[in-house]
Amino acid sequence: MKIAILSRNSKLYSTRRLIEAGRKRGHTVRILDPLRCYMRIAADGFSLHYKGKPITGFDAVIPRIGASVTRYGTAVLRQLEFMGTYTPNPSDAILRSRDKLRAHQLLAAQGIDMPVTVFGDNPDDTQDLLSMLGPPPHVVKLNEGAQGAGVILTEKASASRGVVEALRGLYANFIVQEFIGEAEGADLRCFVVGDKVVAAMRRQAAEGDFRSNLHLGGTAAVAEATEQEQEVAVRSARALGLAVAGVDLIRSRRGPLVLEVNSTPGLEGVEGVCGVDVAAAIVVHLEQSVRRSAG
């Protein structure tokens, strides 16, 4: 099988592991910087070039598209899709996952529970908007933030209003959510491949913080996701159209709540903590999916 990996940096851990896993299973693997890809779109067909040469014959493509190049990267991925290349995470699914508001709407439509979320545009509605959420603490999130950036905890109603008004002044899109205190700064990252959770880890926020992201100083340990948590994680990925996803849950009194569905989850943390060859699981999924589509 001929596999392309859309990545701007071949030295990143996740990219290197996917290369290793693909080649170990006998496949040809090539890294394509999405920003060096360019395309021709016409009624008579789609074509893609890379550094002066046409790109053809790929059976599968693994998108590792950073948030800063989402628009162009997904356009390149979409071109490959139209050219008949299989991808576990289609371009439209990535776009759904990176718009927090849209993602939460889609999850809620499938009956998947999450922290109560509110969204509004007009400053005149701020007080009523926050009253729909209930008393603070509140969590304010940039709609397209990643890795814990643009996430603010407000402990007073006046602080919530101030942050909301400041973000509106910057023309930033954001959502506001209820704060789940019983989670105590911990979440569960479930790594979904296909129709199952292949690994799970519990992440704990650093002292004085409520964000559990590892690169912000959080710690992680291997975890055993319950059957309910695994079901919620798989349903969440499926609701957005993703076959490979990092689904972040928190454990609450009313059950698992989905915080986010990440379409480009890093492998380093989960492989290091859990000792699971997630990269190989992704490649096996590609093999099975391409075989079925050829079938």
Curated annotation (Swiss-Prot):
Obligatory cofactor(s): Mg(2+); Mn(2+)
Broadest EC class assigned to this enzyme: ligase
GO MF: ATP binding; metal ion binding; ribosomal S6-glutamic acid ligase activity
Amino acids binding Mg(2+) 2: E260, N262
Sequence ranges assigned to domain ATP-grasp in this UniProt record: 104-287
Ligand binding (ATP): K141, E178, F179, D187, R211, S212, N213
Name of the protein in its database record: Probable alpha-L-glutamate ligase
Organism: Xanthomonas axonopodis pv. citri (strain 306)
